[in-house]
């Protein structure tokens, strides 16, 4: 029995250190997000309702924000998403796509809160978002994502 309990604590301890170190996992676990991918170099979490979904990722990739934005754009194109536009605002690079009646907006902040630690998000909606509304949504999503950074 003692070995079982010790093993359980070792497993739980290993799981708690499986996400990037700059992410506040206690806060993430208390949020309504569903964790989709949890490794030492990346954490991806998602939340959705009837009309939209938000996917937030934290990564330790050794790339610039622009390189990450371009890579995510390339990956989306390979997944048969139709590229619509790149929208550049003061805070983030935003790539807009359409696929199967849904619009997705890949958001990569230009400046990272922690050096060499990246945050990026995808907002998916059944409706095309106006540029003005997209700016507000981008700021809200990035504020939300950054609230999970230590």
PLM feature segments, named:
Residues 77-115:
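Signature of long, low-cysteine stretches enriched in small and polar/charged residues
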Residues 42-70, 117-125:
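A short acidic-to-branched-hydrophobic micro-motif
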Residues 4-14:
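Sec-dependent N-terminal signal peptides
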Residues 28, 48-53, 99-102:
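Glycine-centered tight beta-turn/hairpin loop motif at sheet-sheet or coil-to-beta transitions
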Residues 19-41:
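Short N-terminal segments immediately surrounding and downstream of signal-peptide cleavage
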Residues 29-33, 122-150:
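Surface-exposed amphipathic alpha-helical segments
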């Amino acid at each position: 029995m003692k070995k079982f309990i010790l093993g359980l604590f070792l497993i739980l301890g290993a799981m708690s250190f499986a996400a990037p170190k700059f992410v506040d996992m206690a806060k993430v676990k208390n949020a309504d997000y569903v964790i989709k991918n949890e490794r030492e170099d990346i954490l991806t979490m998602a939340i959705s309702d009837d009309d939209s979904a938000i996917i937030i990722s934290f990564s330790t990739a050794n790339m610039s924000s622009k390189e990450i934005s371009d890579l995510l754009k390339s990956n989306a194109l390979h997944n048969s998403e139709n590229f619509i536009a790149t929208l550049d605002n003061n805070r983030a690079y935003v790539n807009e796509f359409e696929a199967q009646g849904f619009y997705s907006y890949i958001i990569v902040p230009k400046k990272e809160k922690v050096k060499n630690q990246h945050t990026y998000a995808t907002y998916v909606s059944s409706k095309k978002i106006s540029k003005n509304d997209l700016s507000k949504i981008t700021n809200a999503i990035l504020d939300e994502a950054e609230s999970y950074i230590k």
